[in-house]
Amino acid sequence: MFGTSVSALCLLFLLSVCTACYISNCPIGGKRSALAFPSRKCMACGPGDRGRCFGPNICCGEGMGCYVGSPEAAGCVEENYLPSPCEAGGRVCGSEEGRCAAPGICCDVEGCSIDQSCTEEDEAEYISQSVSSSHGHDLLMKLLNMISHTPPHRVHK
């Protein structure tokens, strides 16, 4: 009985001091170290570096829309190798990890979708800066249609 309680006590002690990270993509310093890094903007991308990376193959920006799987977004894969997390785009939309990327477009690391909440309030500035809202919406629909019918470009090494 005494041996069992000592073994249990030792096991509890080892578990309390164990700080191993069992997730394959843990940041340097462990799971909680990501909270210590200040938030930074994601890498610039696209024509003239006017956009921001939203995922390893997604580049979006004001006045240019989104590039998904194209050469303009190829540099975004480098974001995966940086040690600190980044924050892209405007406010949260769609899923919990989605962000407003352009007027009417919500993106997360996996892809983009049309989201009407991204055309309200903060994103209304994008529309007023570019063209009239009805023309901007037509252009957005054409761009999303092209993206959905175009196979992703592959970067050859």
UniProtKB/Swiss-Prot annotation:
<keyword id="KW-0732">Signal</keyword>
<dbReference type="GO" id="GO:0005615">
    <property type="term" value="C:extracellular space"/>
</dbReference>
<feature type="disulfide bond">
    <location>
        <begin position="93"/>
        <end position="106"/>
    </location>
</feature>
<feature type="signal peptide">
    <location>
        <begin position="1"/>
        <end position="20"/>
    </location>
</feature>
<keyword id="KW-0027">Amidation</keyword>
<dbReference type="InterPro" id="IPR036387">
    <property type="entry name" value="Neurhyp_horm_dom_sf"/>
</dbReference>
<feature type="disulfide bond">
    <location>
        <begin position="21"/>
        <end position="26"/>
    </location>
</feature>
<comment type="similarity">
    <text>Belongs to the vasopressin/oxytocin family.</text>
</comment>
<feature type="disulfide bond">
    <location>
        <begin position="53"/>
        <end position="76"/>
    </location>
</feature>
<keyword id="KW-0165">Cleavage on pair of basic residues</keyword>
<protein>
    <recommendedName>
        <fullName>Isotocin-neurophysin IT 1</fullName>
    </recommendedName>
</protein>
<feature type="modified residue" description="Glycine amide">
    <location>
        <position position="29"/>
    </location>
</feature>
<dbReference type="GO" id="GO:0005185">
    <property type="term" value="F:neurohypophyseal hormone activity"/>
</dbReference>
<dbReference type="InterPro" id="IPR000981">
    <property type="entry name" value="Neurhyp_horm"/>
</dbReference>
<dbReference type="InterPro" id="IPR022423">
    <property type="entry name" value="Neurohypophysial_hormone_CS"/>
</dbReference>
<feature type="disulfide bond">
    <location>
        <begin position="60"/>
        <end position="66"/>
    </location>
</feature>
<feature type="disulfide bond">
    <location>
        <begin position="42"/>
        <end position="86"/>
    </location>
</feature>
<dbReference type="Pfam" id="PF00184">
    <property type="entry name" value="Hormone_5"/>
</dbReference>
<feature type="disulfide bond">
    <location>
        <begin position="100"/>
        <end position="118"/>
    </location>
</feature>
<keyword id="KW-0964">Secreted</keyword>
<feature type="disulfide bond">
    <location>
        <begin position="45"/>
        <end position="59"/>
    </location>
</feature>
<keyword id="KW-1015">Disulfide bond</keyword>
<dbReference type="GO" id="GO:0030141">
    <property type="term" value="C:secretory granule"/>
</dbReference>
<comment type="function">
    <text>Isotocin causes contraction of smooth muscles.</text>
</comment>
<keyword id="KW-0372">Hormone</keyword>
<feature type="disulfide bond">
    <location>
        <begin position="107"/>
        <end position="112"/>
    </location>
</feature>
